[in-house]
């Protein structure tokens, strides 16, 4: 079944501009509170200008262009401008440093980069090293350095025609993006995403949250991340909704922004929920129009109940990863939600729990969550230039091995246990980091927690907890270990604890455990 009707991203935007015209498509708010707004028609014009800019710089179908940007309208212009001429976007995590960024440029053979003034010094050094194919930089900012191979994005883009001057033949099977995974445990892999993937993501995620053209979808997720692209931007645009993109997350400003833009849908990760909960209670806490909060793992039942009760919202759980494009398991529109289940498998997918011999397991037994989709359509096409890694993750029949542990109940609801690489082996027992983190996070003095396994000569691995306390709190080791002993089996109690001011995180809020080992 061809859900997208053979429509590529160029056709999508031309149709959206014709159907919705002056209706607001995009609202962007900077950290300084500066607001920029675009209708569907004007946004399509900006996209066309950007496509023509890339063409004027020698970019053609199949060429790869990197974006190293914080959230901004120009990211949207570039994303779809590249797609309109058949070129390929390579978004770079805005938190990456020089060596990490250079590795992605080299791996994907990028010759052109769009970035902002704050990241320019890093890329000037990369160009001078001649270690990558990078030979031209389009810079977004007020001032332009007097360097060869650098052009002013806004000045050149604004002079372009709003009519496309290069329209190569496009197929929904064409690659639109290479999105490198976060690489919390190893070098990132380039996930190849097609036009079909993105069009499907728009329809699927709009179905998941029952999105309509009178909805306002607000997000603080980074635009270079799959969540922002495929569970926020694509469904919002596909449904003709208004997409509100904030430059950065602020716990103090979040609810005022929800009210300011009359958002009806937003998305949250656990870090956001925890920081919102430590803000002072206000009479306006429940004064908003939110009907759904898209939520991504992982939260304890106590945290979930406290959040939903205080703010009068409900969480719509969605489970997925870069390779699945969307939340392939999740709560469904109108269905009763069964916390802590991550929901049921969505339309056009199959899901199974499998053992270490790749055999399906019955309800109630823990194994690996495996997903069946269509490569290049409902799941990613492949890892860029890594056929062996692709073969390990993706079976020929379309079964994707997620690397996550979970189980399902008799009614087909799935439950996430942990990343398989996060299971600690302690004296013959398997201990879930997520389970311990959920228990420990209930301590009233603790704001953030992560558990890791460290080498132990006797028991294979010992358990260590890294903790961030609420402001002004103190916590002794005796108090911490007593709490653990009273709330978990003895073999699960951590052997060590360390208090920190913060925990290292990637762009999607996931803690980078390799920095804590």
UniProtKB/Swiss-Prot annotation:
UniProt keyword Ligase, yes or no: yes
PROSITE patterns given in the database record: AMP_BINDING
EC number: 6.2.1.48
Domain of life from the UniProt record: Bacteria
Pathway membership, UniProt: Amine and polyamine metabolism; carnitine metabolism
Catalytic activity: 4-(trimethylamino)butanoate + ATP + CoA = 4-(trimethylamino)butanoyl-CoA + AMP + diphosphate; crotonobetaine + ATP + CoA = crotonobetainyl-CoA + AMP + diphosphate; (R)-carnitine + ATP + CoA = (R)-carnitinyl-CoA + AMP + diphosphate
Gene3D superfamilies in UniProt: 3.30.300.30, N-terminal domain of ligase-like
UniProt keyword annotations, A-Z: Ligase
GO biological process: carnitine metabolic process; fatty acid metabolic process
Keyword Secreted: no
GO MF terms held by the record: carnitine-CoA ligase activity; crotonobetaine-CoA ligase activity; medium-chain fatty acid-CoA ligase activity
Pfam families, sorted: AMP-binding (PF00501), AMP-binding_C (PF13193)
Task of the protein: Catalyzes the transfer of CoA to carnitine, generating the initial carnitinyl-CoA needed for the CaiB reaction cycle. Also has activity toward crotonobetaine and gamma-butyrobetaine.
Family: Belongs to the ATP-dependent AMP-binding enzyme family.
NCBIfam families listed in its UniProt record: PRK08008.1 (NF005947)
Protein name: Crotonobetaine/carnitine--CoA ligase
Organism: Salmonella paratyphi B (strain ATCC BAA-1250 / SPB7)
Gene that this polypeptide is encoded by: caiC
């Amino acid at each position: 079944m061809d859900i997208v009707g053979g429509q590529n991203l160029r056709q999508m935007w031309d149709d959206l501009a014709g159907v919705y015209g002056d209706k607001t498509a995009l609202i962007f708010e900077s950290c300084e509170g500066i607001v920029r707004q675009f209708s569907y028609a004007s946004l399509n014009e900006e996209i066309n200008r950007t496509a023509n800019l890339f063409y004027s710089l020698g970019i053609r179908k199949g060429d790869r262009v990197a974006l190293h940007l914080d959230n901004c309208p120009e990211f949207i212009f570039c994303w779809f401008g590249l797609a309109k001429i058949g070129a390929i976007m390579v978004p770079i995590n805005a938190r990456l440093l020089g060596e990490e960024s250079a590795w992605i440029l080299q791996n994907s053979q990028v010759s052109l980069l769009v970035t902002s003034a704050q990241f320019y010094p890093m890329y000037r050094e990369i160009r001078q090293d001649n270690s990558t194919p990078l030979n031209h930089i389009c810079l977004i900012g007020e001032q332009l350095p007097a360097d060869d191979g650098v052009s002013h994005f806004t000045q050149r883009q604004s002079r372009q025609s709003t009519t496309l001057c290069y329209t190569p033949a496009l197929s929904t099977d064409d690659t639109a993006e290479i999105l490198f995974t976060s690489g919390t445990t190893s070098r990132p892999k380039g996930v190849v995403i097609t036009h079909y993937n993105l069009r499907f993501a728009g329809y699927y995620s709009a179905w998941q949250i029952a999105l309509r053209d009178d909805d306002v979808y607000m997000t603080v997720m980074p635009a270079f991340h799959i969540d922002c692209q495929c569970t926020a931007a694509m469904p919002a645009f596909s449904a003709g909704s208004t997409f509100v993109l904030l430059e950065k997350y602020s716990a103090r400003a979040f609810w005022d922004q929800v009210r300011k833009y009359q958002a009806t849908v937003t998305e949250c990760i656990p870090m956001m929920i925890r920081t919102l909960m430590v803000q002072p209670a206000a009479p306006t806490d429940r004064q908003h129009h939110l009907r759904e909060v898209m939520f991504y793992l992982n939260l304890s039942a106590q945290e979930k109940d406290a959040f939903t009760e205080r703010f009068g919202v409900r969480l719509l759980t969605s489970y997925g990863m870069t390779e699945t494009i969307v939340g392939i398991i999740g709560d469904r529109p109108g269905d009763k939600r069964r916390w802590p289940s991550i929901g049921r498998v969505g339309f056009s997918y199959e899901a199974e729990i499998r053992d270490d011999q790749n055999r399906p397991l019955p309800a109630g037994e823990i194994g690996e969550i495996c997903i069946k989709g269509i490569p290049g359509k409902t799941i990613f096409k492949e890892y860029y230039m890594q056929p062996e890694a692709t073969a390990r993750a993706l079976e020929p029949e379309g079964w994707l091995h997620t690397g996550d542990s979970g189980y399902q109940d008799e009614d087909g609801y799935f439950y996430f246990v942990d990343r398989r690489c996060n299971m600690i082996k302690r004296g013959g027992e398997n201990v879930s980091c997520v389970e311990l983190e959920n228990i420990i996070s209930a301590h009233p003095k603790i704001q953030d927690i992560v558990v890791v396994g460290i080498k132990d000569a006797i028991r294979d691995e010992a358990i260590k907890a890294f903790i961030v306390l609420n402001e002004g709190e103190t916590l002794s080791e005796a108090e911490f270990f007593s709490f653990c002993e009273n709330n978990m089996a003895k073999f699960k109690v951590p052997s060590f604890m360390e208090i920190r001011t913060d925990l290292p995180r990637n762009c999607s809020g996931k803690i980078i455990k390799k920095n804590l080992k």
